[in-house]
Design a protein with these regions (language model features):
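Active-site pocket-lining segments that scaffold enzyme catalytic pockets across diverse folds
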Residues: 197-207, 217-220, 225
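Short, charged, surface-exposed loops that flank catalytic or proteolytic processing sites
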Residues: 33, 212-220
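Hydrophobic pocket-lining residues that define ligand/cofactor binding sites across diverse proteins
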Residues: 45, 211, 228
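Conserved short loop/turn motifs at secondary-structure junctions
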Residues: 150-153, 207-215
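Acidic, glycine-rich loop-and-beta core segments that form the ion-binding/anion-interacting portion
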Residues: 222-236
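A composition/biophysics-driven feature that prefers long, compositionally simple stretches
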Residues: 1-202
């Protein structure tokens, strides 16, 4: 099966913020933060002696690449993932085909469309697509793993795990890598967290100003979500 593959451009005159702080000036160098996070993942990968890290948890995928695509939807289905090689490329297997969402991100070396294999997407053709998925992951492991077959995964259904094991890969618990890496915060990340807190507080102020007798709870909560989205937040 031929799948679209795209190498994002490396323009230096623009910093894609992908929703976060889209219409404001970031308080830190976002590309620096992105690179540091990827380094943390790879450091933990080396500690656990794995050649690859497969991320279906969208929080982990965002941490590794900072690329986003319908995060809530993609959190409900195995429809988008990131493969991080210890000594090779980072590959984004995206939902649908939207390479513009990965443009200019220094953390992504290869863009592909995921051959999704969950039933809602492919019905009874799941076995066909999961074999293609496993073939691509196995190829990346063989090409860049240096003979190491250990692949860490944060979360994946038995269908995907069985197909990967059939390719001779040794699957390792990935959350021990992602959680311990993400627990470390740089000074720049603390500044970004403060911005997130400021947005939340602004949303709470909007709720207080909008509150009036007789209104529904949903109407009140909508002001928090409205403020969050308007100021660059993704979801609550």
């Amino acid at each position: 099966m031929s799948l679209a593959s795209f190498n994002p451009s490396r323009k230096t005159n623009k910093v894609r913020q992908h929703g976060a702080m889209e219409f404001s000036d970031p308080p830190v160098d976002l590309d620096k933060v992105r690179q540091e996070r990827l380094v943390r993942f790879r450091k933990k990968m080396a500690e656990h002696e794995v050649a690859g890290l497969l991320l279906f948890n969208q929080i982990n995928a965002r941490y590794a690449t900072d690329a986003t695509n319908m995060q809530i939807w993609c959190s409900h289905y195995e429809t988008r993932c990131v493969f991080v090689s210890l000594e090779g490329p980072v590959v984004l297997f995206d939902y649908a085909d939207h390479p513009h969402l990965a443009e200019d991100l220094p953390t992504i070396d290869d863009y592909r469309v995921l051959p999704a294999f969950y039933f809602f997407s492919v019905g009874n053709r799941g076995e066909e697509f999961v074999l293609e998925f496993a073939a691509q992951i196995s190829d990346l492991m063989n090409r860049y793993g240096g003979g190491n077959k250990r692949l860490a995964i944060d979360t994946l259904s038995h269908t995907g795990c069985d197909a990967l094991r059939a390719r001779g890969l040794e699957l390792v618990e990935g959350e021990q890598i992602t959680e311990t890496a993400r627990a470390i915060k740089s000074d720049d990340e603390l500044k970004l967290m403060q911005v997130s807190m400021n947005v939340c507080q602004e949303g709470m102020r909007a709720m207080q100003e909008y509150l009036e007798p007789g209104m529904t709870e949903n109407a009140l909560w909508s002001k928090l979500h409205e403020t969050n989205i308007r100021l660059g937040g993704e979801w609550i």
